[in-house]
């Protein structure tokens, strides 16, 4: 079986329980690009087949799953950077636009792109893209109100009972996903 890892290139963390926001001036206290190069090479040598890349940490989760206020393609520059240091496929995740993703793949800067919430909003998303029917796509509104209910479960962050794990595939704009 292929082995992949959701790999955070830069932690985007300015202190304990303090994630950094886009454009904010801060000193990185977590993994930076230099450490990321070493870690990515180590993972490749250890036998990983692919790195599914984003940014962020537990304290800066919004880089991994960008909400509406995050810039489009917010992780792409760092993902393109790490691609230059490994020979295994590198996939970018995090509020990617189709045009920018396609261009980056065509230019050989990344090997693929991960789209997840788009499929919750519209399970026919890829078919509509391939058939040039993008105007018919029901877009993800990046609200985190349904797909990330576990981020603040019963008033406690990240404390969802595993018994409820079957109810995580939800989407505020797709009633068929509501369970």
Predicted regions and their residues:
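Flavin-dependent oxidoreductase catalytic cores
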Residues: 1-179
């Amino acid at each position: 079986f292929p082995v992949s890892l959701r790999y955070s290139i830069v932690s985007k963390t300015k202190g304990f329980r303090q994630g950094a926001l886009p454009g904010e001036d801060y000193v990185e206290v977590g993994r930076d690009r230099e450490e990321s190069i070493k870690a990515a090479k180590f993972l490749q040598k250890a036998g990983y087949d692919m790195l599914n890349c984003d940014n962020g940490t537990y304290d800066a989760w919004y880089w991994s799953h960008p909400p509406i206020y995050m810039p489009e393609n917010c992780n792409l520059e760092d993902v393109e950077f790490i691609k230059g240091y490994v020979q295994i496929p590198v996939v970018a995740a995090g509020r990617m636009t189709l045009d920018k993703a396609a261009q980056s793949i065509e230019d050989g800067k990344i090997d693929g792109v991960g789209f997840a919430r788009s499929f919750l909003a519209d399970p026919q998303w890829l078919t509509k893209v391939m058939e040039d029917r993008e105007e018919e796509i029901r877009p993800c509104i990046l609200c985190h109100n349904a797909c990330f209910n576990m981020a603040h479960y019963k008033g406690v962050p990240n404390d969802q009972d595993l018994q409820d794990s079957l109810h995580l595939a939800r989407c505020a704009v797709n009633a068929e996903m509501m369970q």
